[in-house]
């Protein structure tokens, strides 16, 4: 007996050890899953956080002295190794920044006795001098890299044109001029000491004939402007007279006044100090004497282009001058006390604020890659290293409407790439987040009724024999790859919807309504006839009726289209301002709903079928009808599982990639129109991440999109579990 008790104790110890090992394994698995989720979140956050960091500057990265006096222009190469200085005498000197004591490595006299200087819009690198004889010299200093010799031999490229560059004579010298250095149609506008403003340009001729040179003299009303700016294409000229701006455009071989604008907008305390072109020359930066900087660009109003005030930057009155970025839509502001600020116009973000100098430099310029800022003051050149990688990103630019260049009003826009170096990045996450919600909503609108109602019928009403066929068949649908579903939806189903739109619309309304009507008619059939059909086989009788209704719908659709839509439903919708795309939200909703139905159906059906039999039997025994038992007993008991099924389907729909990618036009639209396309977060990540530059704003924003998807899915699942637990506790007593 004692030996038997000892044996039982041994078994209890083994069982206890096994229980502890299994408990440890299960706990470790759960903790491992949570740890993996936390690591994913931390990694995504580490990639995203730099987007919202401030810019940094190292003011004295490289320094060297010069003996040329106040220069006309300065610049530095993309490696801060070579700089040039354009002197007042018209000589350009290339200086090595690596060897501060070394004399100029290359010099060239570009003009003799220059009397006027000008430079092109930011980022283009063209400069111009007019000598005392009225001859214009337009050139572009370059830093050419020769890797084989490990040197960067400088080169000054002159404008190649056969246009006469002699603008005036010595008796009436040029006081200011502007130019566009297009090799096809260069344009020069100048003002002489007498105050006259003239222009000269070349226009292309047809059939290969040499370009025609055109001289144009402005009328007396344009005499002596204080400042002139010309866009790089030579088509738009700005003349500033005090705080008044005259906008002229080139047409019919002359400049004509498009509009005259009061830059103070009626407030005299905002008098204008100077104007500058932003990179790309689409925007105008107006510096006011009170330190305010305003941005203006052309918008389309009443079918006419007009220069419109867009936004203001309230800077201090100690502002000395602005320096626009070379390619991006930002600018640097220099103050008399040496403070340096940098703003980005699109995001309205202050990206840099630092007391970088003892006093404001007399002159400043940016390298072409915008990594180095060169300044001149007191015969000293200083190069500062600038780390300003993500100026275009701010919370407001991501989630609020932004007024982009050329747009008539503020909008939500996602456009990450362009062929232009001066492209204004449009990084609003709202359109792609909206597209994600839109796709998920239409998918759930299609899948939830079919899946939940199908699960109810299969689990509660269907005969066991039919259930053994139907349930595995629907579960088998989940094994279909979504890429195949998306492929069929985009290349096969979308053209069918386009060609038979009216038929699809009719079916969406006719099938649900006719099914309910058939249910009502079935109740009118005598009980003796209904009893001949075994319980659970009603769906089999409904199938021929559905096929018949589909045939009738296809047959009457052309008549409906002819009667109500003038014979072409797509044209009718277009004429009434409703857009139509072949790959649209309707196709996505049907295709993605097809993919989501098995998930919702399986979980909901299992929840309903698992309701204890004694609950429904007790309800029926107390006199309740099967329908009352279903509503008040079965569905209440199974409601936690049904809710979880719907939330799981929602999570699947939100994260779906291939169906949305292949079945839509992938266009980031902000429209609830079911007949237009969309772009989702997941599809954007799949398409753009392989082509994005690692570490760029675009790259990190795609990780932010991934984090949004991750957090949303986690929140949906957490909410589903919370609601499921509460519903289970509420109906536990049933």
Kindly label every feature range from the protein language model.
Residues 13-20, 51-90, 94-123, 128-130, ...:
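Periplasmic/extracellular loop-to-transmembrane helix junction in inner-membrane transport proteins
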Residues 89-95, 133-140, 148, 192-203, ...:
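Structural motif
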Residues 426-440, 494-514, 532-599:
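Loop-to-helix entry region at the N-terminal start of transmembrane alpha-helices
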Residues 443-474, 518-527, 720-729:
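Transmembrane-helix boundary motif in ABC transporter permease subunits
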Residues 517-528, 605, 609, 613, ...:
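C-terminal transmembrane helix and the adjacent membrane-cytosol boundary/short C-terminal tail
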Residues 660-710:
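Interhelical loop and adjacent transmembrane-helix boundary motif
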């Amino acid at each position: 007996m004692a030996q038997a008790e000892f044996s039982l104790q041994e078994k209890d110890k083994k069982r206890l050890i096994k229980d502890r090992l299994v408990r440890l394994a299960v706990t470790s698995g759960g903790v491992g899953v949570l740890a993996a989720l936390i690591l994913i979140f931390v990694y995504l956050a580490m990639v995203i956080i730099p987007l919202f960091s401030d810019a940094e500057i190292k003011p004295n990265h490289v320094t060297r002295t010069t003996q040329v006096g106040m220069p006309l222009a300065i610049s530095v190469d993309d490696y801060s190794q070579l700089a040039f200085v354009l002197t007042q005498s018209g000589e350009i000197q290339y200086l090595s920044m690596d060897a501060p004591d070394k004399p100029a490595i290359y010099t060239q006299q570009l003009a003799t006795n220059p009397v006027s200087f000008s430079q092109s819009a930011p980022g283009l690198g063209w400069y111009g001098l007019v000598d005392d004889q009225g001859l214009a010299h337009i050139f572009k200093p370059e830093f050419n890299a020769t890797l084989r010799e490990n040197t960067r031999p400088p080169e000054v490229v002159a404008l190649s044109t056969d246009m006469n560059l002699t603008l005036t004579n010595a008796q009436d010298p040029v006081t200011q001029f502007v130019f566009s250095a297009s090799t096809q149609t260069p344009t020069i506008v100048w003002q002489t000491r007498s105050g006259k403003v003239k222009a000269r340009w070349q226009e292309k001729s047809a059939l290969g004939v040499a370009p025609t040179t055109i001289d144009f003299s402005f009328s007396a009303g344009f005499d002596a402007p204080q400042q002139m700016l010309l866009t790089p294409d030579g088509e738009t000229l700005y003349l500033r007279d005090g705080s008044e701006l005259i906008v002229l455009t080139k047409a019919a071989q002359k400049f004509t006044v498009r509009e005259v604008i009061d830059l103070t907008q009626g407030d005299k305390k905002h008098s204008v100090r100077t104007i500058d072109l932003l990179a790309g020359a689409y925007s105008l930066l107006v510096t006011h004497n009170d330190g305010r900087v305003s941005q203006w660009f052309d918008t389309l109003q009443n079918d006419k282009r007009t220069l419109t005030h867009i936004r203001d930057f309230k800077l201090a009155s100690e502002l000395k001058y602005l320096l626009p970025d070379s390619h991006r839509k930002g600018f640097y502001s220099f103050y008399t006390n040496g403070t340096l600020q940098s703003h980005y116009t699109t995001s309205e973000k202050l990206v840099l604020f630092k007391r970088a100098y003892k006093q404001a430099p007399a002159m400043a310029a940016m390298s072409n890659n915008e990594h180095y800022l060169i300044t001149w003051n007191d015969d000293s050149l200083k190069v500062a290293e600038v780390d300003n990688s993500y100026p275009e990103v701010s919370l407001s630019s991501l989630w609020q409407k932004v007024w982009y260049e050329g747009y008539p009003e503020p909008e939500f826009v996602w456009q990450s790439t362009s062929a232009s170096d001066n492209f204004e990045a449009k990084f609003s996450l709202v359109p792609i987040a909206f597209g994600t919600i839109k796709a998920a909503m239409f998918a759930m609108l299609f899948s939830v009724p079919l899946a939940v109602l199908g699960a109810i019928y299969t689990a509660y009403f269907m005969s066991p024999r039919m259930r053994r066929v139907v349930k595995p068949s629907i579960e088998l649908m989940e094994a279909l790859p979504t890429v195949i579903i998306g492929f069929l939806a985009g290349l096969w189903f979308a053209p069918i919807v386009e060609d038979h739109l009216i038929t699809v619309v009719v079916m969406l309304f006719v099938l649900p309504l006719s099914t309910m009507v058939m249910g009502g008619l079935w109740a009118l059939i005598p009980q003796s006839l209904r009893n001949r059909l075994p319980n659970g086989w009603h769906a089999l009788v409904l199938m021929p009726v559905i096929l018949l209704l589909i045939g009738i719908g296809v047959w009457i659709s052309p008549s409906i289209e002819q009667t109500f839509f003038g014979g072409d439903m797509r044209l009718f919708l277009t004429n009434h301002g409703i857009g139509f795309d072949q790959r649209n939200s309707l196709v996505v909703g049907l295709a993605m709903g097809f993919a989501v139905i098995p998930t919702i159906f399986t979980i909901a059906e299992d929840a309903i079928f698992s309701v204890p039999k004694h609950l429904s039997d007790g309800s029926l025994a107390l006199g309740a009808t099967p329908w009352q038992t279903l509503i008040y007993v079965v569905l209440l008991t199974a409601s936690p599982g049904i809710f979880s099924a719907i939330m799981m389907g929602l999570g699947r729909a939100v994260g779906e990639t291939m169906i949305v990618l292949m079945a839509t036009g992938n266009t980031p639209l902000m429209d609830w129109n079911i007949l237009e396309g969309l772009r989702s977060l997941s599809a954007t990540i799949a398409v753009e991440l392989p082509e994005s530059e690692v570490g760029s704003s675009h790259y990190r924003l795609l990780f932010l999109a991934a984090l949004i998807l991750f957090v949303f899915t986690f929140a949906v699942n957490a909410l589903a579990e919370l609601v499921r637990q509460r519903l289970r506790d509420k109906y536990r007593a049933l």
